[in-house]
A protein has these predicted regions:
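Mixed-charge (Asp/Glu-Lys/Arg
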Residues: 1-56, 62-157
Length: 157
């Protein structure tokens, strides 16, 4: 499966993302993020299920010690403001051409993958985007430090 994905990576058409950096098409990039997250959680010994079809608001269901969690996977991008190293991901979806927010009824967590680590954020802690910081130029009390959102820290796995 990964060999086929690697072939697609090399042949994938590029497009411009929101930050004007060249990337492959967003659908392929999203699928890669989903695979990275699934692989990470599975390697930790937990089950991951994928819903059939496109009607569900979540991408994966994780079975963490008998508790089923609805997970929406989002691709992160390097946050480009001059505020120290951070990643950002959108916490909205698109349905019928309209931007929609997620609620606790839709999902339990957002998950993203960055530099070998899965980060999870409870849906109730988000608005239209989430920024997780690795370093900052100022020490503001509202900074969301990435280390506090690792899957290990949040879910205790």
């Amino acid at each position: 499966m990964y060999a086929a994905m690697a072939e697609r990576l090399n042949a994938a058409p590029c497009c411009e993302n929101l930050y004007s950096k060249k990337i492959m098409d967003t659908n392929t990039l999203g699928k890669i993020t989903e695979l990275e997250v699934m692989s990470y959680i599975t390697k930790k010994g937990y089950s991951v299920s994928i819903p059939f079809g496109d009607k569900d608001r979540y991408d994966q269901i994780w079975d963490i010690n008998g508790k089923l969690l609805k997970i929406q996977i989002k691709t992160s991008h390097l946050y480009t403001k001059n505020t120290g190293k951070a990643i950002e991901f959108k916490t909205t979806g698109t349905s019928n051409g309209r931007t929609t927010s997620y609620t606790k009824n839709d999902i339990d967590y957002f998950a993203t993958f960055w530099e070998g680590q899965v980060y999870v954020v409870p849906v109730e802690e988000t608005s239209s985007k989430k920024v997780l910081r690795f370093e900052a130029t100022t020490n503001h009390p509202n900074i969301c430090w990435a280390k506090n959102y690792t899957v290990e820290e949040v879910l205790g796995i």
